[in-house]
Amino acid sequence: MSRKILVLPGDGIGPEITREAVKILNACREAGLEASIEEGLVGGAGIDAHGVPLPDETLASAKAADAVLLGAVGGPQWDKIEDLSKRPEKGLLGLRKNLNLFGNLRPALLYPQLASASSLKPEIVAGLDIMIVRELTGGIYFGQPRGIEERDGERVGYNTYIYAEHEIERIGRVAFEMARERGGKLCSVDKANVLEATILWREVMERLAPEYPDVALSHMYVDNAAMQLVRAPKQFDVIVTGNMFGDILSDAAAMLTGSIGMLPSASLNEQRQGMYEPCHGSAPDIAGQGIANPLATILSVAMMLRYSLEAPQLAERIERAVGTVLDQGLRTADIAFEGTAPVSTQAMGDAVLAAFQAQ
């Protein structure tokens, strides 16, 4: 069965890094992957061409696709747009909402070749391999009511932190399944000593636990989890948490690895349709210079093959190819050591392609 892949380069460095990832996708097709590749506009590119960050044709193509590969959205040229619903980032949020992408997978994996690039001592982070499972469509980012209004002569801003049982249960199942496939440890992060919504979160996680007797469930308050990620990160295997806490913790975990330019992500719905993107942003300050790191986007393709396209062997080939290139000493500027000459975006992509094809 032929699969459909939609590529959305987006803004900033997005077109440069997705170009390298598409090379790898085409190599996968040559290796037997039955898939068609289509390209579309999103974010600032959508605004410039159609006046909206998520054009109708892009959304229609995304709904028809098995997987979406996104580069990055946003840039200073669109920061003056006063209507927040017309900002580039709303294109990303619109895709998440319309595709019902409730589960976000953010690996924090330290490649041994890059251990010295971490901000922590090598002995603390060596062998680090964490998967953060973040609920993506509920919580305080989407809760109603919300707004800014006048009360008693002053402006008041308010938001609603809300989770329904079914939202917690479905992300919980994703996390338990992930822990079962990995090291068998799941840490649920909440703030159940203060927030009723996360008291319910903890109750639902506890209720699911007997269905997964091979997974050891623990709980941690989010403030302690942030501290433990820096103090002793290797205690974690899989972390599951809500939208806001996951947003913060996954970025903190990302920097344990030395470069956010190495880290992919996946956002899935219940049918395993997914959107795959690097964890980094559009980096407008280096856009067009050919120096961006494409590895996070290439590794996002590996996640796509594993979780949406049922091609885990090809995913492993990509991951091995990235390891080979790092073994060869090739580094883009963000992961280059002092005294080493960084390679270009294209050179890094070509090297991964060669290592992939050599297997």
From Swiss-Prot:
It holds the Pfam family Iso_dh. The gene is leuB. GO terms for molecular function: 3-isopropylmalate dehydrogenase activity; magnesium ion binding; NAD binding. NAD(+) binds at residues 281-293. Belongs to the isocitrate and isopropylmalate dehydrogenases family. LeuB type 1 subfamily. Its cofactor is Mg(2+); Mn(2+). Catalyzes the oxidation of 3-carboxy-2-hydroxy-4-methylpentanoate (3-isopropylmalate) to 3-carboxy-4-methyl-2-oxopentanoate. The product decarboxylates to 4-methyl-2 oxopentanoate. Substrate binds at residues 96, 106, 134, 223. The keyword Repeat does not apply. InterPro entries: IsoCit/isopropylmalate_DH_CS, IsoPropMal-DH-like_dom, Isopropylmalate_DH. Pathway: Amino-acid biosynthesis; L-leucine biosynthesis; L-leucine from 3-methyl-2-oxobutanoate: step 3/4. It is found in: Cytoplasm. Keywords: Amino-acid biosynthesis, Branched-chain amino acid biosynthesis, Cytoplasm, Leucine biosynthesis, Magnesium, Manganese, Metal-binding, NAD, Oxidoreductase. Mg(2+) binds at residues 223, 247, 251. Its main location: cytoplasm. Homodimer. GO terms for cellular component: cytosol. The record marks 141, 191 as: Important for catalysis. GO terms for biological process: L-leucine biosynthetic process. Its EC number is 1.1.1.85. Binds 1 Mg(2+) or Mn(2+) ion per subunit. The keyword Manganese applies. This is 3-isopropylmalate dehydrogenase. It catalyses: (2R,3S)-3-isopropylmalate + NAD(+) = 4-methyl-2-oxopentanoate + CO2 + NADH. It comes from the Bacteria.
